[in-house]
Curated annotation (Swiss-Prot):
The gene is BAS3. This is Biotrophy-associated secreted protein 3. Induction: Expression is highly up-regulated in invasive hyphae. The keyword Transcription regulation does not apply. Keywords: Secreted, Signal. It comes from Pyricularia oryzae (strain 70-15 / ATCC MYA-4617 / FGSC 8958) (Rice blast fungus). The keyword Protease does not apply. GO terms for cellular component: extracellular region. Residues 1-20 form the signal peptide. Secreted effector involved in biotrophic colonization of plant cells. It is found in: Secreted. The lineage of its organism: Eukaryota, Fungi, Dikarya, Ascomycota, Pezizomycotina.
Length: 113
């Protein structure tokens, strides 16, 4: 079998064409949700609004007291936290501001009425 000049030219430039093609980019991973375990003092928690379950919750985030609510089925926050922390007991709390979903493993245990 003989190669024509055109066939030879195609085989000669094919590797260069493949190398010039842009590589497939992998999807950009979502940034990790923040995880905070330190609870607010009771006096700070008492200032927080109640969640739909009538409990007040507060977490210390970088030295600041942040009120959080148990967002439950209203968002995918809890599911995302369970996946991220690889723990079925993980919880996700909703807030307003820079961190709309905050992960927590202790369930914001100082929650109370």
């Amino acid at each position: 079998m003989q190669f024509s000049t055109v066939s030879f030219a195609i085989f000669a430039i094919l590797p260069a064409m493949v190398a010039a093609m842009p590589a497939e980019t992998s999807p950009v991973p979502k940034p990790a949700l923040p995880v905070f375990e330190e609870l607010c003092p009771d006096a700070e928690r008492q200032k927080c609004a109640e969640s739909t379950d009538n409990l007040k919750r507060c977490l210390q985030i970088n030295g600041a007291s942040i009120c959080v609510i148990d967002c439950g089925s209203q968002t995918t926050c809890r599911t995302q936290c369970k996946q991220q922390l690889k723990n079925e007991k993980a919880n996700g709390f909703c807030t307003v501001g820079d961190n709309p979903c905050i992960c927590n493993l202790n369930g914001a245990a100082n929650s109370a009425h």
